[in-house]
Amino acid sequence: MAFAPQFTVTARLLRELETIADLKAKIATAAIQVTWTPRLQQDSRQRGAHASTAIEGNPLTLAEVRALEGGTPLPDHTERAQREVLNYFASLRWIEKRAKQSKPITHEDIFRLHQLLAGGVMDQGEAGRYRTIAVRVGKHLLPSPDLVSGFMRELLAWWNGPSAEWSPVLTSAILHYQFEDIHPFADGNGRAGRMLALWELYRRGFDTHHIFSIDEFYGEDRPRYYAGLAAVPGAGGDLTAWLEYTTEGVRTTLERVWLRVQQLAAKSGPKKTVLRPSQEKLLRLLRDHHEGLAPAELWAALAVTKQGAAHILAPLLKTKLIRRVGTRKNGRYLLA
């Protein structure tokens, strides 16, 4: 039986989608300098990691998440608490790469994502394998283990096919809910479901620059988030109220991104920094290497000499887009 989500396109839903489209266009055409993008990406990545793990009870603050990504150990927190956050970052890097591929999404992709996200931090079951035990969320008894694979097959068929007819804002929310309703793994379904929703936005080109995360909206009012999920079965499976809630979240998140863009524009002033391709490449490298790069690693990655690297680095250091930390002998370059 094919998966066919039930919902009604209400006036509220249309208003939210129209506002979202307007905000998205403003952000895309706001002359966002490439120099800003790594900062926005880093901020979004860290806020998403903090929010999604905090929803599940992780105790790290946003400041601690930022420090952990930068390579600072947190001795006051358990290894598991830190591993949950590091797993989130690893999963995010994976979906960023996978979203660029046009091939259909498979069970193996879902397994791989779950392995990255839940490896070493599960209370029960095995990361990367569908559950073999019965689970319940509140009063809601979820599908029996023998039905999980079939339900996931139906969801993937919809995701790889009919979902393309709808806005990614809607399909990401539908994926999120349906994945949680199936609850295919013994543990880690919440983080995985939110990551699937983000994956859908990436692969459909909605968040091309990867500069926002709706998880922060969910995390700010967890009771409302859980109530939104729990209300769907009581509505006979109708997703309308859930979609109205999630589109409100996307709109709120984009409003915040737009504010951050304006703040960055104000700080940078009217003069724009024009970057050479090698400098853009360096910023992308530093975005992906959160622990930074040593000078020798930087020269090798850019295929330049020490002198050539100096010409690339100087304008970025002067405009405070990057910074150097450590000693003269053991220093590293990081995004500012």
Regions found by a protein language model. Name each.
Residues 1-336:
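FIC/Doc superfamily catalytic core
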